[in-house]
């Protein structure tokens, strides 16, 4: 059946066989969707469980999660660089280089994870003070404890991300999904036991994360070294300057872009934190629910890297454009369904959390802003640039993201949140303005075709 589909569609590409069938795309996107759904669901469970420990605890965890997200994007950016390079080599049918680059990704991820973990463990308190200034003492203590414990998991998380990126590059996201299911079961069961049975606080949320990430890293690395996969990871890995440079050539601009993006988010949350615990808690709950609305877009964005990377490596710009449009359409349809559902059942969803009436009302308003705007703007703002990254057009995406964050999101957040006193609502309106700028720039870049000149075999 798959062969028949490929033959029928071949004339669309001048008689060339499509690099991906409909079934290939579904096999890639489906497990990624499940994996993203699990991640967000467990994040919601974490927030709900820790909310039972009081609003100081939920505020401390939410503030540190912004820092954790900043760290995680470093690992994700490196994994993205590796996935792009491996996908391009596979598309060009250069198996030897694809194998070598997979080993370099694992080595670089391990080094980065250990370095960042030690740094955050030692400097947890000054990091939180630097990011958020004067916050309540109980919120600070909860945040320091949570950051130090989660820092222990960074090396495991970095290596898991590397392994998952390699399997995505092979078009096999099912393996990372299976391991993710186990990881999230360990996490959520551990949280329940630690908080409800043992009576622990924020440490009861943090330690299960460490355990689950350690198990996931061991399992996925074990699968990477098994035979029978499209890639053969070298058993002995030494740093290869040329190959590492190629991976970092994609990873560093992506890391810089995403790190500054997360740093910008931390800055705007620091503005919100000056308005008190109600605004911090409402912002935390809204962020968790909005993460649910972005699940399909994030999954398709990851698939975009593999698909476009393979097309670019094969030197087929026509298929690159075709699959970019196809996946972007999938993102709009799926995000419409998810965000529509969130808006429809918004009050019951927010009601799950143990919030005061004032906090609940604000959280509902923030989700309405995000979900209503995300229907139209999020896919082109965050899924489309992954196609540009996979074509090595990373500097453009970096410049647009950084400038848009600095000028629109930070600038208007200060104006609306601080100067006009709108609080969290002002920050979220500024976020929508940032999205509009990103959409205009990324759509124009894709249509211009300038990305076609960035890849060199």
Regions found by a protein language model. Name each.
Residues 37-59, 128-137, 193-200, 259-292, ...:
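Helix-terminus/linker motif at the lipid-water interface of multi-pass membrane proteins
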Residues 27-46, 149, 183, 212-216, ...:
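Transmembrane helical elements of multi-pass membrane transporters/channels
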Residues 58-118, 157-176, 269, 280-346, ...:
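Small-residue-rich hydrophobic transmembrane alpha-helices
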Residues 79, 149-168, 176-187, 205-220, ...:
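Short runs within selected transmembrane alpha-helices of multi-pass transporters and secretion channels
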Residues 50-69, 137-142, 202-203, 243-250, ...:
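Interfacial/gating helices of multi-pass transporter permease domains
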């Amino acid at each position: 059946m798959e062969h028949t589909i490929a033959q029928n569609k071949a004339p669309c590409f001048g008689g060339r066989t499509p690099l991906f069938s409909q079934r290939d795309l579904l096999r890639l996107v489906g497990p990624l969707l499940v994996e993203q759904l699990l991640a967000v669901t467990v994040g919601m469970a974490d927030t709900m469980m820790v909310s039972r420990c009081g609003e100081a605890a939920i505020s401390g965890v939410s503030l540190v999660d912004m820092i954790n997200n900043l760290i995680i994007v470093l690992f994700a950016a490196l994994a993205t660089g590796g996935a792009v390079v491996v996908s391009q080599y596979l598309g060009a049918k250069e198996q030897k280089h694809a194998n070598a680059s997979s080993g370099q990704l694992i080595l670089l991820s391990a080094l980065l994870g250990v370095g960042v973990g030690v740094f955050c463990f030692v400097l947890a308190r000054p990091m939180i003070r630097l990011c958020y200034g004067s916050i309540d003492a109980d919120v600070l203590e909860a945040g320091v404890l949570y950051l130090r414990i989660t820092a222990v998991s960074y090396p495991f998380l970095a290596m898991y991300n590397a392994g998952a990126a390699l399997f995505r590059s092979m078009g096999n996201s099912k393996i990372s999904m299976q391991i993710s299911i186990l990881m999230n079961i360990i996490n959520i069961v551990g949280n329940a036991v630690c908080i409800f049975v043992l009576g622990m606080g924020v440490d009861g949320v943090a330690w299960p994360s460490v355990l689950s990430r350690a198990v996931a890293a061991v399992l996925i690395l074990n699968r990477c070294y098994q035979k029978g996969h499209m890639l053969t990871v070298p058993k002995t890995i030494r740093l290869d300057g040329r190959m590492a440079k190629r991976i970092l050539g994609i990873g560093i601009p992506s890391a810089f872009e995403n790190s500054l993006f997360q740093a910008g988010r931390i800055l705007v949350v620091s503005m919100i934190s000056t308005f008190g615990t109600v605004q911090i808690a409402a912002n935390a709950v809204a962020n968790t629910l909005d993460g649910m609305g972005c699940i399909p877009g994030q999954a398709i964005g990851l698939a975009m890297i593999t698909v476009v990377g393979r097309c670019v490596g094969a030197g087929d710009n026509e298929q690159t454009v075709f699959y970019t449009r196809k996946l972007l359409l999938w993102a709009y349809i799926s995000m419409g369904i998810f965000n529509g559902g969130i808006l429809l059942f918004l009050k019951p969803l927010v009601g799950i959390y143990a919030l005061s009436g004032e906090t609940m009302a604000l959280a509902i308003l923030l989700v309405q802003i995000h979900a209503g705007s995300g229907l139209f703007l999020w896919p082109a703002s965050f899924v489309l640039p992954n196609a540009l990254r996979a074509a090595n057009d990373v500097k453009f995406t970096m410049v647009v993201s950084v400038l848009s964050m600095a000028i629109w999101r930070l600038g208007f957040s200060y104006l609306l949140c601080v100067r006009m006193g709108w609080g969290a609502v002002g920050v979220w309106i500024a976020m929508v303005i940032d999205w509009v700028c990103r959409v205009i720039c990324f759509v124009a870049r894709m249509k211009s075709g300038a990305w076609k000149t960035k890849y060199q075999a």
